[in-house]
């Protein structure tokens, strides 16, 4: 299935690229989410006519993501969880907990933007967490996990 991308898609292509994808990926994700349109002559002509509009929208989204990344630069948050005397948490601190903690201190963050490479935290300590705010914008923040008896 050939599609024209209306925005940048990680590991696939950039705005305006004509890509070939498996039919299920195109029908079930790219087309319903408005990320791509079928690569027909009419759609190609319509895309060329609106290309400047799409590029302006992509630039504004990138600028907004960079502004958010600047707010997160050097930010840290403390998350409290029940822990044993050895420092092991009785549960874990995951992406949802981190997103809620940042939102509580006035830095809105969604769970899907938090990247935990090695899974949820199960020990007390300080961790560096990657935030994926846009396809081209990432930021690193510090999360301090404190234990409460």
Curated annotation (Swiss-Prot):
Highest rank taxon of the organism: Bacteria
Matches recorded under InterPro entries: Ribosomal_bL9, Ribosomal_bL9/RNase_H1_N, Ribosomal_bL9_bac/chp, Ribosomal_bL9_C, Ribosomal_bL9_C_sf, Ribosomal_bL9_N, Ribosomal_bL9_N_sf
SUPFAM superfamilies to which the protein is assigned, alphabetical: L9 N-domain-like, Ribosomal protein L9 C-domain
Keywords associated with the record: Ribonucleoprotein, Ribosomal protein, RNA-binding, rRNA-binding
GO MF terms, alphabetically ordered: rRNA binding; structural constituent of ribosome
One GO BP annotation of this record: translation
Residues in the signal sequence: none
TM helices/strands, residue ranges: none
Database matches in Pfam families: Ribosomal_L9_C, Ribosomal_L9_N
Keyword Ribosomal protein carried by entry: yes
Gene Ontology CC: one annotated term: ribonucleoprotein complex
Family indicated by similarity: Belongs to the bacterial ribosomal protein bL9 family.
Function according to Swiss-Prot or TrEMBL: Binds to the 23S rRNA.
Name assigned to this protein: Large ribosomal subunit protein bL9
Organism: Xylella fastidiosa (strain Temecula1 / ATCC 700964)
């Amino acid at each position: 299935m050939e599609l024209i991308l209306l925005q940048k898609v990680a590991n696939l292509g950039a705005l305006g690229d004509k890509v070939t994808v498996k039919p299920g990926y195109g029908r079930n994700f790219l087309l319903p989410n408005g990320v791509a349109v079928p690569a027909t002559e009419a759609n190609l002509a319509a895309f060329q006519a609106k290309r400047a509009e799409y590029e302006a929208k992509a630039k504004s989204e990138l600028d907004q993501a960079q502004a958010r990344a600047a707010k997160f630069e050097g930010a840290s948050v403390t998350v409290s969880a029940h822990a044993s005397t050895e420092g092991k948490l009785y549960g874990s601190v995951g992406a949802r907990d981190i997103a809620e903690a940042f939102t509580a201190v006035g830095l809105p963050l969604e769970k899907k933007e938090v990247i935990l490479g090695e899974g949820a935290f199960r020990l007390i300590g300080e961790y560096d967490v990657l935030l994926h705010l846009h396809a081209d914008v990432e930021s690193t923040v510090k999360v301090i996990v404190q234990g409460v008896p």
